[in-house]
C-alpha cells in the first residue's frame, strides 16, 4: 500500500514540474524578441482597437465647495496583441498567463479631468493574456475628478459629472479607443447615502485640433447624480420654516409684555445662522444662487420686515396726545377701514359699512369741536368777569358790615340811619351768598372740565393703542400669507422634492 502511495505522489510531482516547465517555456517564447514599446499591430498603418469599460464601485464624496467628486471604480481594458498568440496544445493546454504592468505594451489612456496629485491614481495590477492574444487589464483606483457643480436648485439638484478617458500621445489613427459593451457597469455599485444614481451613460467623441489633421478620440462616462433631500429637509428646511413661523408669534404678543422686539431679533439671528451654514456648503460662485439660499434669504427678509413693523407697532402703542396728533387719514384707515376689513371688534364701537367714513375725509366734527372750544373760551372769560364782580361785591359787603358794626358801637348815631344801613346789609348778604355759590359752581365746572379733558386724552391714547393692535393684526395676516406663498412658490419650482 505504501508503495502505491509513493508512486502516485511521484506522478503528481512530475506533472507539476512538467506543467511549470511548459509555462516557463511559454513565457520565454512570448517574451523572445518582444518589445513593449511596439504597438501590437501587424501593419503599422492600422490602429490598435482598445475597448474600455468602467465598473463603478462607490461614490465616496462630492465636494461641492471645491467641485471635486471622489469615486472608487475599476477600469476594464481589452485589446489584442498579435505578438502574444500561442497554440494551447503545444504548451500543455495553458489558456492564459499573467504579466506585470509595464512588461508588455499597454495603452497610455489617462483620465483627462483628474485632479489627483499623482494624476494617474490607478493600481498597476497584472495583465491577463489569453492564447488568442486578447489582453485583459483591470486596474482599480480611487479617482478624483473635477466636476462643474450646478447649485441653482440645491438641495434639490441633479449633477452630471463624467470621466473623460483618452490616449495621451496616440491619435485616432494609431489607437482607436472604443467603449466596451455595457460600458458603465454598476452591478457592484454600493449606494451612496447622499446621492442617488438614476442614470449612467457612455459617449464617444472625436476632437480635431488646429495643429493636426488627425482625430483624437475620447470616451465620456457620465454620472447622473440626484441628491437625496431627506437630510436637508429635516436638518435645515424644517427648522428654518418653524423658526420663521415664530415671527408670527411676535404679532400676537401684547406690546406691554416687553418681549416683543426681543423675540423678533432672536429669530433674525437664528435665520442668519442657518444662512451661514448654507453659504459654507455652497461653492464660492456668482453664477447662480442656490434655491435653499433664496429660501433662507426670503426668510431673513420676512424676519427683518417683521422686526421693523414690530418697532412701528411699539411706536404707535406708546404715543400720547401731548406728542402726536392722529391725522384724519390715519384715523379713518386704522380705526375704521382696516378693522372692518379684518373683522376686528372694539368694545363700544359697532363698525358697519354704512358707518365707515370716507378714507380721505377730514377729521370728523372738527368745526363743531372748534365752535364748542370758542364757546367754552367765552364762557371762561365771562366766568372770570363774574368772578371779578363777585369779588368786588363781596369786598363791599365786608366793608359795609364793618361800618355797620362801627356805627352800632357809637351811640351818637341816629337809629334811623342804622336801620337803613342794616337793610342795605341784608341785600348785600344775599348777593354775597349767591356769589359764593357761583364761585363754587365755577370751581366744580373747572374740575369737570379737567375730568372731561382727561377722558379725551385717555380716549386718544386708546385710539393709538387700538391702531397698534390693528397694525399688529394686519401684519399677522400679511406675513402668514407671504410665508406660505413664498415657501410653496420656492420649493414648487424645484425639479423634484424627494429622491
UniProtKB/Swiss-Prot annotation:
Residues 20-232, 495-499 are extracellular. GO terms for molecular function: acetylcholine-gated monoatomic cation-selective channel activity; excitatory extracellular ligand-gated monoatomic ion channel activity; transmembrane signaling receptor activity; transmitter-gated monoatomic ion channel activity involved in regulation of postsynaptic membrane potential. InterPro entries: Neur_chan_lig-bd, Neur_chan_lig-bd_sf, Neur_channel, Neuro-gated_channel_TM_sf, Neuro_actylchol_rec, Neurotrans-gated_channel_TM, Neurotransmitter_ion_chnl_CS, Nicotinic_acetylcholine_rcpt. GO terms for biological process: chemical synaptic transmission; monoatomic ion transmembrane transport; regulation of membrane potential. Residues 1-19 form the signal peptide. It comes from the Eukaryota. One of its GO terms (cellular component) is postsynaptic membrane. Keywords: Cell membrane, Disulfide bond, Glycoprotein, Ion channel, Ion transport, Ligand-gated ion channel, Membrane, Postsynaptic cell membrane, Receptor, Signal, Synapse, Transmembrane, Transmembrane helix, Transport. It is found in: Postsynaptic cell membrane; Cell membrane. Glycans are attached at residues 43, 93. Disulfide bonds join 147-161, 211-212. Residues 310-473 are cytoplasmic. It is a multi-pass membrane protein. The chain crosses the membrane at residues 233-253, 261-281, 289-309, 474-494. Belongs to the ligand-gated ion channel (TC 1.A.9) family. Acetylcholine receptor (TC 1.A.9.1) subfamily. PANTHER family: NEUROTRANSMITTER GATED ION CHANNEL (PTHR18945). After binding acetylcholine, the AChR responds by an extensive change in conformation that affects all subunits and leads to opening of an ion-conducting channel across the plasma membrane. A subunit of the levamisole-insensitive nicotinic receptor. NCBIfam families: LIC. This is Acetylcholine receptor subunit alpha-type acr-16. It comes from Caenorhabditis briggsae.
Amino acid at each position: 500500500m505504501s508503495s502505491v502511495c509513493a508512486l502516485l505522489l511521484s506522478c503528481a510531482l512530475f506533472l507539476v514540474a512538467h506543467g511549470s516547465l511548459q509555462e516557463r517555456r511559454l513565457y520565454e517564447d512570448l517574451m523572445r524578441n518582444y518589445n513593449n514599446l511596439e504597438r501590437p499591430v501587424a501593419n503599422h498603418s492600422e490602429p490598435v482597437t482598445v475597448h474600455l469599460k468602467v465598473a463603478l464601485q462607490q461614490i465616496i464624496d462630492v465636494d461641492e465647495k471645491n467641485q471635486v467628486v471622489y469615486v472608487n471604480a475599476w477600469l476594464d481594458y481589452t485589446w489584442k496583441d498579435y505578438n502574444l498568440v500561442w497554440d494551447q496544445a503545444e504548451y500543455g493546454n495553458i489558456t492564459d498567463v499573467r504579466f506585470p504592468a509595464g512588461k508588455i505594451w499597454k495603452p497610455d489612456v489617462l483620465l483627462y479631468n483628474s485632479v489627483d496629485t499623482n494624476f494617474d491614481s490607478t493600481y498597476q495590477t497584472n495583465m491577463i493574456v489569453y492564447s488568442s492574444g486578447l489582453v485583459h487589464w483591470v486596474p482599480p483606483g480611487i479617482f478624483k475628478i473635477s466636476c462643474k457643480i450646478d447649485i441653482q436648485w440645491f438641495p434639490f439638484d441633479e449633477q452630471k459629472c463624467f470621466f473623460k478617458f483618452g490616449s495621451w500621445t496616440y491619435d485616432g489613427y494609431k489607437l482607436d479607443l472604443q467603449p466596451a459593451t455595457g460600458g458603465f457597469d454598476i452591478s457592484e455599485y454600493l449606494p451612496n447615502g447622499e446621492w442617488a444614481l438614476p442614470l449612467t451613460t457612455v459617449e464617444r467623441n472625436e476632437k480635431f485640433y488646429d495643429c493636426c489633421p488627425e482625430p483624437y478620440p475620447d470616451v465620456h462616462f457620465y454620472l447622473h447624480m440626484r441628491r437625496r433631500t431627506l437630510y436637508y429637509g429635516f436638518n435645515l428646511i424644517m427648522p428654518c420654516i418653524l423658526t420663521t413661523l415664530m415671527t408670527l408669534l411676535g404679532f400676537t404678543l401684547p406690546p406691554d409684555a416687553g418681549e416683543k422686539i426681543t423675540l423678533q431679533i432672536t429669530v433674525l439671528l437664528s435665520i442668519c445662522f442657518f444662512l451661514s451654514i448654507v453659504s459654507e456648503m455652497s461653492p464660492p460662485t456668482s453664477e447662480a444662487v442656490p434655491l435653499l439660499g433664496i429660501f433662507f434669504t426670503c426668510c431673513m427678509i420676512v424676519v427683518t420686515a417683521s422686526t421693523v413693523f414690530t418697532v412701528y407697532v411699539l411706536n404707535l402703542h406708546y404715543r400720547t396726545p401731548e406728542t402726536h396728533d392722529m391725522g384724519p387719514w390715519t384715523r379713518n384707515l386704522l380705526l375704521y377701514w382696516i378693522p372692518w376689513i379684518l373683522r376686528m371688534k372694539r368694545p363700544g364701537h359697532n363698525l358697519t359699512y354704512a358707518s365707515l367714513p370716507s378714507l380721505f375725509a377730514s377729521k370728523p366734527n372738527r368745526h363743531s369741536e372748534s365752535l364748542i372750544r370758542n364757546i367754552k373760551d367765552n364762557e371762561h372769560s365771562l366766568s372770570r368777569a363774574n368772578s371779578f364782580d363777585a369779588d368786588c361785591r363781596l369786598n363791599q359787603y365786608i366793608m359795609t358790615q364793618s361800618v355797620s358794626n362801627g356805627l352800632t358801637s357809637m351811640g351818637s348815631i341816629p337809629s334811623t340811619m342804622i336801620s337803613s344801613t342794616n337793610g342795605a346789609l341784608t341785600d348785600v348778604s344775599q348777593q354775597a351768598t349767591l356769589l359764593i355759590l357761583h364761585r363754587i359752581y365755577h370751581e366744580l365746572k373747572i374740575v369737570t372740565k379737567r375730568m372731561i379733558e382727561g377722558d379725551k386724552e385717555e380716549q386718544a391714547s386708546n385710539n393709538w393703542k387700538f391702531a397698534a393692535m390693528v397694525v399688529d393684526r394686519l401684519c399677522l395676516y400679511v406675513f402668514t400669507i407671504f410665508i406660505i406663498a413664498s415657501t410653496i412658490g420656492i420649493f414648487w419650482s424645484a425639479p423634484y422634492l424627494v429622491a
